[in-house]
């Protein structure tokens, strides 16, 4: 009898994606983050679904409905903190996944990479709207500040902001539509992730050496299924420890105060995973310039394949580029730290220097260094 997984139309797709998929024999644990992001997305959709059963998207009751979830719903506190900290785990995996792509030259798969950049924007939009929903002080003021940035767009800016708000300020209409979008976007992300995988499987995975692995493939199952399960268990361990021991470690205390339009918090700042972009935004004194820099800080990833000047794909055999890559990582950590600091000396100048270094490394220094490495190897 013919094996059902190779003949059944639905099973065939699963089989060719997760069972009989030919995978390079030398991919390291850095290749685990794709599956971990899938696990994170499933956790977020499931916990979000149960939260939505008890949440009300009305300015009068949103804050108290979240309180009700934590106090009165069976294991509501657990679901709420799994969802909040699950977002942090999601972004940790995302940043490591993108970093892996930059280091090993995975961006040379253009379609896969560009859909990945689109996914990054979609996840950031979803996280931003989700942060508004508890309707605490930082939710309200974060929404006000970030949506207000669109007013920097010439001619249509102020109309666009009012259109998004559904009025003349962040209010009930804004909260309701943010809840609607926050609910639907994860399913759009899941669909995009499917397309991301589709394009990846057209070419096959990259590997640490950046060389073709066609001559040395192994089946995905059992080798990489067991490896991915180990990764998922470690992710679950970290998330569980975070949720059960210090669930508010990554949150903002201001969000435990109900939203008050008449009282501005002393330091308005987004969640930790947006701080690097927020620091770049704040480092430019001009409003439109800041908004453009903010968008470009992420959009620059789409131009990385065009800036690849090396004859080698991966950084595995390129020590100079490796050094610059880790300087870039340190720079991003510096920007994240600066984003959480008040706008005063010396943080302003540190933020400006870190922002200049960020764009200089990606646009100028790394491509030139790659050319130097080519010459050193007489290529």
From Swiss-Prot:
InterPro entries: Cyt_b/b6_C, Cyt_b/b6_C_sf, Cyt_b/b6_N, Cytb/b6-like_sf, Cytochrome_b, Cytochrome_b_C_euk/bac, Cytochrome_b_N_euk/bac, Di-haem_cyt_TM. Heme b b566 binds at residues 97, 196. The chain crosses the membrane at residues 33-53, 77-98, 113-133, 178-198, 226-246, 288-308, 320-340, 347-367. It holds the Pfam family Cytochrom_B_C. Its main location: mitochondrion. The keyword Transmembrane helix applies. It comes from the Eukaryota. Heme b b562 binds at residues 83, 182. GO terms for cellular component: mitochondrial inner membrane; respiratory chain complex III. A ubiquinone binds at residue 201. GO terms for biological process: mitochondrial electron transport, ubiquinol to cytochrome c. Binds 2 heme b groups non-covalently. It is found in: Mitochondrion inner membrane. One of its GO terms (molecular function) is metal ion binding. Keywords: Electron transport, Heme, Iron, Membrane, Metal-binding, Mitochondrion, Mitochondrion inner membrane, Respiratory chain, Transmembrane, Transmembrane helix, Transport, Ubiquinone. CDD domains: cytochrome_b_C (cd00290), Cytochrome_b_N (cd00284). Its cofactor is heme b. Heme 1 (or BL or b562) is low-potential and absorbs at about 562 nm, and heme 2 (or BH or b566) is high-potential and absorbs at about 566 nm. Belongs to the cytochrome b family. Component of the ubiquinol-cytochrome c reductase complex (complex III or cytochrome b-c1 complex) that is part of the mitochondrial respiratory chain. The b-c1 complex mediates electron transfer from ubiquinol to cytochrome c. Contributes to the generation of a proton gradient across the mitochondrial membrane that is then used for ATP synthesis. The cytochrome bc1 complex contains 11 subunits: 3 respiratory subunits (MT-CYB, CYC1 and UQCRFS1), 2 core proteins (UQCRC1 and UQCRC2) and 6 low-molecular weight proteins (UQCRH/QCR6, UQCRB/QCR7, UQCRQ/QCR8, UQCR10/QCR9, UQCR11/QCR10 and a cleavage product of UQCRFS1). This cytochrome bc1 complex then forms a dimer. This is Cytochrome b. It comes from Cryptotis mexicana.
